[in-house]
C-alpha cells in the first residue's frame, strides 16, 4: 500500500501532466506543490511509484508520466469531483430547457457535453424497454380509422394510424382510451402485454376485433422501438489531442463509428454512480488509449439511458466527471418536466 506522501506525489504528477502535457520532474514538483520534502526524496518516491507501475518514463531522459494504473488510483482515491459553478449550471439548464422535443433534448445534450468537456460526447436515447407509459391517446380520424399516440415518461411520442375492421364510434373510442390508461399509465413497457391481454373480453363482441387491432398496434410499436439509438458529437475535439495517442487517432475514430461498440461502452455504466473506464480497461482495442466517463440519466429514480464522453487518458478527470454528472442530472430534470 502506498504511503500518504507517495499518494500526494502521484496526485501532483497527474495534475501537472494533465495541465502541462509534459513529463514532470522532481524539482518541478517540489516547486509547484507543497510536498514538504526535498527533490531527492521526491525522486525516491517516483522510483517507488514506477516500480509499482503507477508512472512510467516515456524516454530515459524525460520525467515520468502516469500509467493507466496511476490514473486509476487517482480517480478512485485522489480525485475530488469538481462541481460546476452557479453560472455554468444556469447556462446548462437554460440551454436544455429550450429543447422542443426528445430529439432536440438529445441533440442539445450532445452539443453541450462536447462543449463543456472538450471531449467526444455520446448520448443514448431513452430506451422504451426501461420507460413507463405516461399516457395513451386514442383519436377517431374516420368511422373505421384511429390514431394511437403513445407518450412515455421521458417525453418520447410515438404515433400510429390504425385501420379498424369495423366502424368504431366516439363513445367506444373514449371508453377504450379510458380503460387503456387505467391499465397501463405509470407502468413499465415490459409489463404492458400482460396488463392488456384480457382487455378485449371486457368489450361487446362487435367491438372486440377493433380493440384487439388497437392492442396489437400498441404492442408492435413497443417491439419496433426497442432498438437502441444514440447520438455522438464533438469528434473534432480529438484532433486537439493527437499527440496523446501512441501512433494515430484512426483506431479511435473507427471505434467511434461503430454504434455497437459505443452502446456496449454505455451499457457498462452504472445507472446512478459514475463509471470511469481508463485505457486498457476498455475492451475494444481501438479505445485502449482513451478514457470513458459515463453515467445513467432518467426522469425518476431509475435510469432510462446513459450518456458520457470519450477522450484521451490524459484527461481532467475531476472537471469531466463533474460536467458529466451535472448534465445527466439536468437532462433528467428536463425529461421529468416535459
Swiss-Prot record:
The lineage of its organism: Bacteria, Bacillati, Actinomycetota, Actinomycetes, Kitasatosporales. GO terms for biological process: negative regulation of DNA-templated transcription. Belongs to the HrcA family. Keywords: Repressor, Stress response, Transcription, Transcription regulation. One of its GO terms (molecular function) is DNA binding. InterPro entries: GAF-like_dom_sf, HrcA, HrcA_C, WH-like_DNA-bd_sf, WH_DNA-bd_sf, WHTH_transcript_rep_HrcA_IDD. Negative regulator of class I heat shock genes (grpE-dnaK-dnaJ and groELS operons). Prevents heat-shock induction of these operons. Pfam families: HrcA. It comes from the Bacteria. This is Heat-inducible transcription repressor HrcA.
Amino acid at each position: 500500500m502506498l504511503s500518504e506522501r507517495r499518494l500526494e506525489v502521484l496526485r501532483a504528477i497527474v495534475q501537472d501532466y494533465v495541465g502541462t502535457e509534459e513529463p514532470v520532474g522532481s524539482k518541478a514538483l517540489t516547486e509547484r506543490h507543497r510536498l514538504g520534502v526535498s527533490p531527492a526524496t521526491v525522486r525516491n518516491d517516483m522510483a517507488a511509484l514506477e516500480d509499482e507501475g503507477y508512472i512510467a518514463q516515456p524516454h530515459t531522459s524525460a520525467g515520468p508520466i502516469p500509467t493507466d494504473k496511476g490514473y486509476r488510483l487517482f480517480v478512485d482515491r485522489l480525485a475530488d469531483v469538481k462541481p460546476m459553478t452557479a453560472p455554468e449550471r444556469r447556462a446548462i439548464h437554460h440551454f436544455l430547457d429550450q429543447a422542443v422535443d426528445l430529439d432536440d433534448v438529445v441533440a442539445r445534450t450532445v452539443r453541450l457535453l462536447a462543449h463543456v468537456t472538450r471531449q467526444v460526447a455520446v448520448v443514448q436515447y431513452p430506451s422504451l424497454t426501461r420507460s413507463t407509459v405516461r399516457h395513451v391517446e386514442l383519436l377517431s380520424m374516420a368511422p373505421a380509422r384511429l390514431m394511437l399516440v403513445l407518450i412515455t415518461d421521458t417525453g418520447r411520442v410515438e404515433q400510429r394510424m390504425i385501420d379498424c375492421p369495423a366502424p368504431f364510434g366516439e363513445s367506444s373510442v373514449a371508453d377504450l382510451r379510458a380503460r387503456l390508461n387505467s391499465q397501463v399509465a405509470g407502468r413499465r413497457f415490459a409489463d404492458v402485454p400482460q396488463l392488456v391481454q384480457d382487455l378485449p373480453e371486457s368489450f361487446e363482441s362487435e367491438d372486440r376485433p377493433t380493440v384487439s387491432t388497437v392492442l396489437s398496434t400498441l404492442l408492435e410499436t413497443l417491439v419496433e422501438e426497442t432498438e437502441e439509438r444514440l447520438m455522438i458529437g464533438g469528434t473534432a475535439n480529438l484532433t486537439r489531442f493527437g499527440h496523446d495517442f501512441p501512433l494515430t487517432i484512426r483506431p479511435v475514430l473507427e471505434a467511434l463509428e461503430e454504434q455497437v461498440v459505443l452502446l456496449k461502452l454505455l451499457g457498462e455504466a452504472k445507472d446512478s454512480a459514475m463509471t470511469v473506464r481508463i485505457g486498457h480497461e476498455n475492451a475494444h482495442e481501438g479505445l485502449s488509449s482513451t478514457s470513458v466517463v459515463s453515467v445513467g440519466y432518467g426522469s425518476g429514480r431509475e435510469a432510462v439511458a446513459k450518456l458520457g464522453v470519450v477522450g484521451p487518458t490524459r484527461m481532467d478527470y475531476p472537471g469531466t466527471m463533474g460536467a458529466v454528472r451535472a448534465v445527466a442530472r439536468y437532462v433528467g430534470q428536463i425529461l421529468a418536466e416535459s
